[in-house]
A protein has these predicted regions:
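N-terminal alpha-helical modules
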Residues: 21-140
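Positively charged n-region of N-terminal signal peptides that target proteins for export
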Residues: 1-5
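Bacterial N-terminal signal peptides
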Residues: 7-18
């Protein structure tokens, strides 16, 4: 596993495990509207990336649930296959995301903005994928 991926995993894991704490950085004296340094900026960017990832996971689960429901109701004869393809597509998308954001990290590796740039990449791609899934599966 590459260093950028390890850092991203640690940052996202920390956010997911401490979502209640991370949701309110003000309790830590951090103003995400005006972070006072790189570390605070990175923490805030990590929170935003975690929120985008959580939303993506929820929409992905809705899409799979919709496909299973339509297959069970007989409304879609190929929905079981569509769900399998969606799973494969999501796994491939995750690899694409990781490689894209690792490249962003590497490009910024000599500066202090590398973690923030990677978190921005993860956030942007997660939001884009969430929109795609909503559009493809007509989810609200």
């Amino acid at each position: 596993m590459t260093l950028p991926r390890v850092l991203a995993s640690v940052a996202l894991w920390g956010c997911l495990c401490g979502a209640a704490i991370a949701a309110d950085r003000s309790a830590e004296g951090i103003d995400c509207a005006q972070p006072s340094g790189t570390m605070e900026s990175d923490l805030c960017a990590s929170d935003v990336a975690s929120e985008a990832d959580t939303e993506l996971n929820a929409v992905y689960a809705q899409a799979r649930q919709q496909l299973r429901r339509q297959a069970a109701e007989g409304a879609c004869t190929h929905c079981a296959d569509a769900e399998k393809q969606l799973i494969l597509a999501q796994r491939a998308w995750m690899q694409l995301r990781d490689h894209d954001c690792d490249a962003v990290y590497a490009f910024n590796a000599d500066g202090t903005s590398r973690n923030g740039a990677q978190m921005h990449c993860l956030t942007t791609l997660a939001r884009d994928r969430t929109r795609q899934l909503r559009d493809f599966y007509e989810l609200l």
